[in-house]
């Protein structure tokens, strides 16, 4: 099961601010979080039942530093459609 500590941040960019007008919030989490796990966390900690959840997995880029090969962390983003008039900003966690 997912935990509140698995949610890293809510993403605020030009694209996501436009989506927020439509009631969609973009949340960045660790890769192990599932849709059902995120739904449970939103219900438990924020008291919000999402209407729809879409997920997007982003693999870490391979980078070189001083001749050594490394890889950035993988992340997972969720596009969460909230009921009309509800936002995560006006709820207490």
Swiss-Prot record:
Q: Which SUPFAM superfamilies match?
A: Ribosomal proteins S24e, L23 and L15e (SSF54189)
Residues in the signal sequence = none
The answer to whether keyword Isomerase applies is: no
Q: Name one GO cellular component term.
A: ribosome
Q: Which GO terms describe its molecular function?
A: rRNA binding; structural constituent of ribosome
Ranges in coiled-coil conformation? none
Please name the InterPro entries in this protein's record.
Nucleotide-bd_a/b_plait_sf (IPR012677), Ribosomal_uL23-like (IPR013025), Ribosomal_uL23/eL15/eS24_sf (IPR012678)
Q: What does the UniProt keyword field contain?
A: Ribonucleoprotein, Ribosomal protein, RNA-binding, rRNA-binding
- One biological process term in Gene Ontology: translation
- What does the function comment of this entry state? One of the early assembly proteins it binds 23S rRNA. One of the proteins that surrounds the polypeptide exit tunnel on the outside of the ribosome. Forms the main docking site for trigger factor binding to the ribosome.
* Subunit structure and binding partners: Part of the 50S ribosomal subunit. Contacts protein L29, and trigger factor when it is bound to the ribosome.
Regarding protein family, the annotation reads: Belongs to the universal ribosomal protein uL23 family.
Q: What is this protein called?
A: Large ribosomal subunit protein uL23
Q: What is the lineage of its organism?
A: Bacteria, Pseudomonadati, Campylobacterota, Epsilonproteobacteria, Campylobacterales
Gene for this chain: rplW
């Amino acid at each position: 099961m997912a935990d509140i500590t698995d949610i890293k941040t809510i993403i605020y960019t030009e694209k996501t601010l436009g989506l927020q007008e439509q009631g969609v919030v973009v949340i960045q989490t660790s890769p192990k979080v599932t849709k059902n796990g995120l739904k449970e966390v939103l219900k438990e900690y924020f008291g919000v039942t999402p209407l729809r959840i879409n997920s997007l997995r982003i693999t870490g880029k391979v980078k070189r530093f001083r001749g050594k090969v490394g890889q950035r962390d993988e992340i997972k983003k969720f596009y969460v459609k909230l009921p009309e008039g509800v936002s995560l900003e006006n709820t207490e966690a």
